[in-house]
């Protein structure tokens, strides 16, 4: 069974997310644990978490298919000490929110070194992750491959491996693969040999069991453009035929697919429908 959903709004409360997910045709989702553009975050009340967990059960969403995404302001690679420290403290709070909600996975962008260099940026990311992981429990941090722009660290998978290799609690660090970011950085998933190479690289660097989520996004720009502009499924340079190749791999089908395509719930419902149309159109076998 395909596990699919979208990044969902929390404006109506955490407890609305499971129902809204099912309403758009999903059985998986991603949310922000707080206002993504704020340094402020607070733990949800016991009443809120009780309602949320009840709705998760009511709508039959598996906890392995529930994800949080860290806020936009966090930058663990920042050479600015005040920003780095605020990032560490906010990430700790996000982990605590996830743990209270019962969500096991928290996705993060590793960060941008802002010109200080990849080596220094990587060291700061590792130091920050160690501080967060050593002061929290249970929640697994997912390192996402990012776009190849600015001082971003993590646009190549071996950069994510360097981070994970240096972290103390490796069992609490796994990865997310974003199809737009990868395409943007030169990973061509529109061809069978490209997907095979990607899967082989993930297996070699991390083990495929460490791939916990796929951000399913088309790309507004061509392969290797380093622009980072998500597009609706089938409407970008990956396209229907490209996604058909990607979807045909059993290893890909085992991982939850989360849409971060332009638009809201209505557009995401259409994109989920489009995914299944591609599967049917290209006669893709699904377990």
Swiss-Prot record:
Cofactor(s) needed for function: Zn(2+)
Catalysed reactions listed for this entry: Endonucleolytic cleavage to 5'-phosphooligonucleotide end-products
Binding site for Zn(2+) 2: 144, 178, 215, 260
Annotated positions binding Zn(2+) 1: 69, 109, 144
Superkingdom of the source species: Bacteria
Keyword Nuclease: yes
Keyword Nuclease: yes
Record's function text: Endonuclease IV plays a role in DNA repair. It cleaves phosphodiester bonds at apurinic or apyrimidinic (AP) sites, generating a 3'-hydroxyl group and a 5'-terminal sugar phosphate.
Name of the featured protein: Probable endonuclease 4
Organism: Thermotoga petrophila (strain ATCC BAA-488 / DSM 13995 / JCM 10881 / RKU-1)
Gene that encodes the chain: nfo
């Amino acid at each position: 069974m395909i596990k699919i959903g979208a990044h969902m709004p929390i404006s109506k409360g955490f407890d609305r997310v499971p129902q809204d997910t099912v309403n758009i045709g999903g059985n998986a989702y991603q949310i922000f644990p707080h206002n993504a553009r704020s340094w402020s975050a607070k733990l949800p009340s016991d009443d809120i978490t009780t309602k949320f967990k009840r709705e998760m059960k009511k709508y039959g969403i598996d906890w392995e298919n529930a994800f949080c995404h860290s806020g936009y302001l966090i930058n663990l690679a920042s050479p600015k000490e005040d920003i780095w420290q605020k990032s560490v403290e906010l990430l700790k709070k996000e982990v605590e929110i996830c743990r209270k909600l019962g969500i096991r996975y928290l996705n993060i962008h590793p960060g941008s070194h802002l010109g200080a260099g990849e080596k220094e940026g990587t060291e700061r990311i590792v130091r920050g992750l160690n501080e967060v992981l050593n002061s929290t429990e249970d929640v697994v941090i997912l390192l996402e491959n990012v776009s190849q722009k600015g001082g971003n660290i993590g646009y190549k998978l071996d950069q994510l491996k360097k981070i994970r290799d240096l972290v103390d609690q490796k069992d609490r660090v796994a990865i997310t693969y974003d199809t737009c970011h990868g395409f943007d950085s030169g990973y061509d998933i529109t061809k069978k040999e490209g997907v095979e190479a990607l899967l082989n690289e993930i297996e070699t660097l991390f083990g495929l069991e460490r791939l916990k989520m796929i951000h399913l996004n088309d790309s507004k720009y061509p392969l290797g453009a380093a622009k980072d502009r998500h597009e609706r499924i089938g409407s970008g340079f990956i396209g229907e035929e490209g996604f058909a190749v990607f979807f045909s791999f059993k290893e890909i089908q085992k991982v939850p697919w989360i849409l971060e395509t332009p638009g809201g719930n209505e557009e995401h419902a259409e994109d989920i429908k489009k995914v299944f149309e591609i599967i049917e159109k290209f006669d893709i076998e699904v377990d």
